[in-house]
């Protein structure tokens, strides 16, 4: 482990927000294992939230947008604050193709350039909508779905694909606009996956991102999937993200007034495409198939479709229409009800996966990581990178995925 980062952590007071989250848990474990002489760790824990693209708009604004400015205001009141390290996501950059540079947002900037984002107006509109649905006597479930739809509509108005990345982008804007002299670093990881090496290879909490697809594929639930197989799957192990966070903090803790963005991913340094991942999954489950409830071996077979239009036609004809017919039969025949419920549940589960991953499986962008690469070169010159890995070039994707598929299954 390189001495600079270990020394940086010694006698430090660190506040970690969202401390019950996957990334934060790995960060806290890493800090304590590296430097037991850290002065204080304050861990902010709150009730669980659904951190997803489907979050209702008012909740997402409260957490991702105004939560960020609340942290900044708190940091300003601290005695001699050294750095505010804000974790965002690369997907705040939207769905545009090509090389995407590490650039922070200007206040009010939109992705499509058609409308200026007024964050206070967005909060007012969200509050008005929520109040309107309550006054109309809508149920909690109806209100939640309506607020999700409203958030998606607002996001797309400005060029963002979903509520989550839109509200995260607005959070970045507020930090940049109101930071004054506060040193701020924004870290934008790509899709965070299980550990590469620390605390041991393949660790992950629950089923996240790629792991859920692996399980549904292995169980034979995933019959078709929307994916451009030539698209790069930009994933990064969680321990590499945490290593980057600590290395970046150590490098910037004395930079007064800095406002830097770091992309932390693999697409620019060591890309892996979806076709490769599919082939790895296929090879694994051919050798080690799962066993179904009936005791029969499951042989997964997935139809991969590269465009959304073709996918909709295929799924409507192949699955949705037969399920709807089965639903009609279940009304007049009790024996068909369980069969209908089973197939309908599987179909909805698969469609939810597709909806969740659509912005990523058709994504044509490559995230530039010039700032991260500069820091890596600096650490390599000090012979530190070997012990404190942040370089995705060292990942052998075949080995990485075989361990993950084995653990997930």
From Swiss-Prot:
BP GO annotations: lipid metabolic process
SUPFAM superfamilies, sorted: NAD(P)-binding Rossmann-fold domains (SSF51735)
Keyword Lipid biosynthesis appears in the UniProt entry: yes
Pfam families, alphabetized: NAD_binding_4, Sterile
Domain of life: Eukaryota
GO molecular function, one term: alcohol-forming very long-chain fatty acyl-CoA reductase activity
Keywords: Lipid biosynthesis, Lipid metabolism
Family: Belongs to the fatty acyl-CoA reductase family.
Name this protein carries in UniProt: Putative fatty acyl-CoA reductase 7
UniProt source species: Arabidopsis thaliana
Gene name tied to this protein: FAR7
């Amino acid at each position: 482990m390189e001495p600079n980062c270990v020394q940086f952590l010694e006698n430090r007071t660190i506040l970690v927000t969202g401390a019950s989250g996957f990334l934060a848990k790995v960060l806290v474990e890493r800090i304590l294992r590296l430097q037991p002489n850290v002065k204080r760790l304050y861990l902010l824990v709150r009730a669980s939230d659904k951190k997803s693209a489907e979050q209702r708009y008012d909740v997402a604004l409260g957490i991702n947008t105004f939560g960020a400015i609340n942290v900044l205001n708190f940091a300003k009141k601290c005695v001699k604050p050294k750095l505010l390290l804000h974790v965002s996501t690369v997907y705040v950059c939207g769905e545009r193709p090509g090389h995407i540079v590490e650039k922070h947002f200007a206040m009010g900037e939109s992705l499509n350039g058609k409308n200026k984002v007024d964050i206070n107006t967005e909060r007012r509109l969200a509050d008005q909508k929520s109040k309107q649905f309550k006054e109309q006597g809508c149920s909690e479930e109806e209100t939640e779905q309506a607020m999700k739809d409203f958030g998606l509509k607002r996001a797309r108005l400005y060029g963002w694909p979903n509520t989550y990345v839109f509200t995260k982008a607005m959070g970045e804007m507020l930090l940049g606009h109101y930071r004054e002299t506060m040193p701020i670093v924004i870290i934008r990881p790509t899709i965070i996956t299980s550990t590469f090496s620390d605390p041991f290879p393949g660790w992950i909490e629950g089923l996240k991102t790629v792991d859920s697809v692996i399980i549904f594929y292995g169980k034979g639930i995933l019959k078709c999937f929307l994916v451009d197989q030539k698209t790069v799957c930009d994933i990064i192990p969680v321990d590499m993200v945490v290593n980057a966070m600590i290395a970046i903090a150590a490098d910037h803790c004395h930079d007064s007034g800095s406002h830097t963005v770091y992309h932390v991913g693999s697409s620019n340094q060591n890309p892996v495409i979806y076709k490769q991942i599919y082939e790895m999954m296929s090879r694994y489950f051919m050798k080690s198939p799962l066993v179904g409830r009936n005791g029969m071996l499951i042989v997964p077979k997935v139809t991969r479709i590269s465009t959304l239009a073709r996918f909709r036609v295929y799924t409507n004809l192949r699955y949705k229409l037969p399920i709807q017919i089965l639903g009609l039969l279940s009304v007049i025949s009790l024996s068909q009800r369980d069969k209908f419920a089973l197939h309908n549940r599987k179909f909805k589960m698969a469609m939810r996966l597709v909806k969740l991953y659509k912005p990523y499986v058709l994504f044509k962008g490559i995230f530039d990581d010039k700032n991260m690469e500069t820091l890596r070169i600096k650490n390599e010159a000090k012979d530190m990178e070997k012990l404190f890995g942040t370089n995705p070039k060292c990942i052998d994707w075949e080995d990485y995925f075989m361990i993950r598929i084995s653990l997930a299954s």
